[in-house]
Amino acid sequence: MLERLYDANIYNILSRLRPEKVRNKAIELYWVFRAIHICHAPLVLDIVRYEEPDFAELAFICAAYFGEPQVMYLLYKYMPLTRAVLTDAIQISLESNNQVGICYAYLMGGSLKGLVSAPLRKRLRAKLRSQRKKKDVLSPHDFLLLLQ
């Protein structure tokens, strides 16, 4: 029962972001939810391969909602995602209070503009810039600490 409520919640959020695609691909989305929920990245990729290219975008947004970095990374490597998709992934992660999804979508090139406060956004950019100058990689854990 709780699982169905969880699916209904993400389904409603997705239908606000991409109404037409969600309406037409409800059954496929159900299987993507199940595959992501058990963190089975190859199965997600197998489902996505047999659909239209923009279905991978929906799967990526779902993976951000569930906070599954392996699935997000696999889909990111499978198909180049636009900044708008990454921003939608951040937005859905904020709505689900999933910091892992926010972190990975931002590190893959998403924008926080309009989604988090300006001072926090500036602090994050400054930290990432200083890390790049040091030729050091900011770990996702450190990024999550900055979000708090």
Curated annotation (Swiss-Prot):
Plays a role in virus cell tropism, and may be required for efficient virus replication in macrophages. This is Protein MGF 360-18R. Belongs to the asfivirus MGF 360 family. It comes from the Viruses.
